[in-house]
Protein backbone atom coordinates (compact mmCIF):
# COMPACT_ATOMS: atom_id res chain seq x y z
CA UNK A 1 0.00 0.00 0.00
CA UNK A 2 2.83 2.35 0.85
CA UNK A 3 4.47 1.63 -2.52
CA UNK A 4 1.26 2.51 -4.36
CA UNK A 5 0.93 5.78 -2.44
CA UNK A 6 4.53 6.74 -3.21
CA UNK A 7 3.98 5.86 -6.88
CA UNK A 8 0.87 8.06 -6.99
CA UNK A 9 2.81 10.85 -5.28
CA UNK A 10 5.61 10.53 -7.82
CA UNK A 11 3.18 10.66 -10.73
CA UNK A 12 1.49 13.74 -9.26
CA UNK A 13 4.87 15.39 -8.83
CA UNK A 14 5.85 14.70 -12.45
CA UNK A 15 2.48 15.93 -13.75
CA UNK A 16 2.78 19.13 -11.69
CA UNK A 17 6.31 19.73 -13.00
CA UNK A 18 5.21 19.24 -16.62
CA UNK A 19 2.17 21.52 -16.22
CA UNK A 20 4.28 24.20 -14.55
CA UNK A 21 6.78 24.05 -17.41
CA UNK A 22 3.90 24.47 -19.86
CA UNK A 23 2.64 27.57 -18.08
CA UNK A 24 6.15 28.98 -17.73
CA UNK A 25 6.50 28.79 -21.50
CA UNK A 26 3.17 30.60 -21.78
CA UNK A 27 4.48 33.28 -19.41
CA UNK A 28 7.65 33.56 -21.47
CA UNK A 29 5.68 34.03 -24.67
CA UNK A 30 3.46 36.66 -23.03
CA UNK A 31 6.46 38.60 -21.68
CA UNK A 32 8.21 38.45 -25.05
CA UNK A 33 5.02 39.70 -26.66
CA UNK A 34 4.84 42.70 -24.34
CA UNK A 35 8.54 43.44 -24.77
CA UNK A 36 8.12 43.47 -28.55
CA UNK A 37 5.02 45.68 -28.22
CA UNK A 38 2.56 43.11 -29.50
CA UNK A 39 0.02 40.90 -27.90
CA UNK A 40 1.20 37.51 -26.75
CA UNK A 41 -0.67 34.27 -27.35
CA UNK A 42 -4.31 35.15 -26.66
CA UNK A 43 -6.24 33.51 -29.49
CA UNK A 44 -7.08 30.23 -27.74
CA UNK A 45 -9.54 30.29 -24.87
CA UNK A 46 -9.54 32.88 -22.12
CA UNK A 47 -6.36 35.00 -22.33
CA UNK A 48 -4.49 32.17 -24.08
CA UNK A 49 -4.40 29.88 -21.04
CA UNK A 50 -5.04 26.65 -23.04
CA UNK A 51 -2.26 27.62 -25.48
CA UNK A 52 0.41 25.23 -24.03
CA UNK A 53 -1.96 22.29 -24.36
CA UNK A 54 -2.77 23.24 -27.95
CA UNK A 55 0.96 23.46 -28.65
CA UNK A 56 1.43 19.97 -27.19
CA UNK A 57 -1.37 18.59 -29.38
CA UNK A 58 0.22 20.25 -32.41
CA UNK A 59 3.63 18.76 -31.61
CA UNK A 60 2.26 15.25 -31.10
CA UNK A 61 0.28 15.30 -34.35
CA UNK A 62 3.14 16.51 -36.54
CA UNK A 63 4.67 14.11 -39.02
CA UNK A 64 7.60 12.18 -37.60
CA UNK A 65 10.69 12.45 -39.77
CA UNK A 66 13.99 10.69 -39.35
CA UNK A 67 17.19 10.48 -41.36
CA UNK A 68 17.14 7.77 -44.00
CA UNK A 69 20.18 5.80 -42.80
CA UNK A 70 19.66 6.29 -39.07
CA UNK A 71 19.21 3.64 -36.42
CA UNK A 72 15.49 4.15 -35.94
CA UNK A 73 15.04 2.75 -32.42
CA UNK A 74 17.97 4.45 -30.72
CA UNK A 75 17.29 7.68 -32.62
CA UNK A 76 13.83 7.94 -31.00
CA UNK A 77 14.57 6.35 -27.62
CA UNK A 78 17.43 8.68 -26.66
CA UNK A 79 15.35 11.91 -26.32
CA UNK A 80 12.65 10.00 -24.43
CA UNK A 81 15.27 8.60 -22.07
CA UNK A 82 16.69 12.11 -21.60
CA UNK A 83 13.23 13.39 -20.65
CA UNK A 84 12.79 10.59 -18.11
CA UNK A 85 16.20 11.31 -16.60
CA UNK A 86 15.37 14.99 -16.18
CA UNK A 87 12.10 14.03 -14.49
CA UNK A 88 13.88 11.57 -12.18
CA UNK A 89 15.99 14.43 -10.84
CA UNK A 90 12.85 15.81 -9.19
CA UNK A 91 12.57 12.67 -7.06
CA UNK A 92 15.54 13.65 -4.91
CA UNK A 93 14.28 17.15 -4.09
CA UNK A 94 13.29 17.59 -0.45
CA UNK A 95 9.58 18.16 0.14
CA UNK A 96 7.41 18.59 3.21
CA UNK A 97 5.79 15.25 2.45
CA UNK A 98 8.35 12.46 2.42
CA UNK A 99 8.09 11.29 -1.16
CA UNK A 100 11.40 9.46 -1.35
CA UNK A 101 13.72 9.79 1.58
CA UNK A 102 17.27 8.67 1.04
CA UNK A 103 20.55 10.02 2.29
CA UNK A 104 22.36 10.13 -1.04
CA UNK A 105 20.09 12.60 -2.84
CA UNK A 106 22.98 14.78 -4.00
CA UNK A 107 24.77 11.81 -5.49
CA UNK A 108 21.55 10.71 -7.19
CA UNK A 109 21.23 14.21 -8.67
CA UNK A 110 24.77 14.10 -10.04
CA UNK A 111 24.26 10.60 -11.46
CA UNK A 112 21.01 11.51 -13.22
CA UNK A 113 22.47 14.66 -14.72
CA UNK A 114 25.61 12.86 -15.86
CA UNK A 115 23.59 10.08 -17.53
CA UNK A 116 21.94 12.73 -19.68
CA UNK A 117 25.26 13.10 -21.48
CA UNK A 118 24.98 9.61 -22.93
CA UNK A 119 21.60 10.32 -24.48
CA UNK A 120 23.07 13.20 -26.48
CA UNK A 121 25.94 11.01 -27.61
CA UNK A 122 23.61 8.15 -28.62
CA UNK A 123 21.35 10.56 -30.51
CA UNK A 124 24.31 11.90 -32.48
CA UNK A 125 25.70 8.43 -33.15
CA UNK A 126 22.39 6.86 -34.16
CA UNK A 127 21.74 9.43 -36.88
CA UNK A 128 24.69 7.97 -38.87
CA UNK A 129 25.79 11.46 -39.84
CA UNK A 130 29.31 12.67 -39.22
CA UNK A 131 28.15 16.20 -38.45
CA UNK A 132 25.56 15.06 -35.92
CA UNK A 133 28.15 12.79 -34.31
CA UNK A 134 30.65 15.65 -34.04
CA UNK A 135 27.96 17.91 -32.60
CA UNK A 136 27.00 15.23 -30.08
CA UNK A 137 30.63 14.74 -29.05
CA UNK A 138 31.11 18.49 -28.62
CA UNK A 139 27.97 18.67 -26.47
CA UNK A 140 29.24 15.72 -24.40
CA UNK A 141 32.62 17.38 -23.82
CA UNK A 142 30.99 20.66 -22.84
CA UNK A 143 28.48 19.01 -20.50
CA UNK A 144 31.14 16.92 -18.78
CA UNK A 145 33.32 19.99 -18.20
CA UNK A 146 30.38 21.84 -16.66
CA UNK A 147 29.41 18.86 -14.51
CA UNK A 148 32.89 18.65 -13.01
CA UNK A 149 32.71 22.26 -11.85
CA UNK A 150 29.13 21.76 -10.60
CA UNK A 151 30.19 18.72 -8.57
CA UNK A 152 33.19 20.55 -7.11
CA UNK A 153 31.04 23.52 -6.10
CA UNK A 154 28.45 21.19 -4.57
CA UNK A 155 31.08 19.29 -2.59
CA UNK A 156 32.60 22.56 -1.41
CA UNK A 157 29.21 23.74 -0.13
CA UNK A 158 28.67 20.37 1.55
CA UNK A 159 32.11 20.48 3.14
CA UNK A 160 31.70 24.01 4.48
CA UNK A 161 28.22 23.28 5.81
CA UNK A 162 29.60 20.42 7.89
CA UNK A 163 32.30 22.59 9.49
Swiss-Prot record:
Topology of the protein relative to the lipid bilayer: Multi-pass membrane protein
GO MF term set: NADH dehydrogenase (ubiquinone) activity
EC code(s) of this entry: 7.1.1.2
Compartments it resides in: Mitochondrion inner membrane
InterPro entries: NADH_UbQ_OxRdtase_su1/FPO (IPR001694), NADH_UbQ_OxRdtase_su1_CS (IPR018086)
Main localization (coarse): mitochondrion
Family matches, as PROSITE patterns: COMPLEX1_ND1_1 (PS00667)
Transmembrane segments: 3-23, 77-97, 104-124, 143-163
Listed Pfam families: NADHdh
Coiled-coil segments on the chain, per record: none
Biological processes, Gene Ontology terms: aerobic respiration
Keywords from the UniProt entry: Electron transport, Membrane, Mitochondrion, Mitochondrion inner membrane, NAD, Respiratory chain, Translocase, Transmembrane, Transmembrane helix, Transport, Ubiquinone
EC primary class: translocase
Catalytically driven reaction(s): a ubiquinone + NADH + 5 H(+)(in) = a ubiquinol + NAD(+) + 4 H(+)(out)
Gene Ontology CC entries for this record: mitochondrial inner membrane
Family: Belongs to the complex I subunit 1 family.
Stored PANTHER family: NADH DEHYDROGENASE SUBUNIT 1, NADH-UBIQUINONE OXIDOREDUCTASE CHAIN 1
Reported function: Core subunit of the mitochondrial membrane respiratory chain NADH dehydrogenase (Complex I) that is believed to belong to the minimal assembly required for catalysis. Complex I functions in the transfer of electrons from NADH to the respiratory chain. The immediate electron acceptor for the enzyme is believed to be ubiquinone.
Protein name per the record: NADH-ubiquinone oxidoreductase chain 1
Organism: Drosophila madeirensis (Fruit fly)
Amino acid sequence: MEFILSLIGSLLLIICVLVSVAFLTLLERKVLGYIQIRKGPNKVGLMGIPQPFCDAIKLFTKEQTYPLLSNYLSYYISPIFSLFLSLFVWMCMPFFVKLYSFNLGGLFFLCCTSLGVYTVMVAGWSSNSNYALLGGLRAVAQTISYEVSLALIGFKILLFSLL
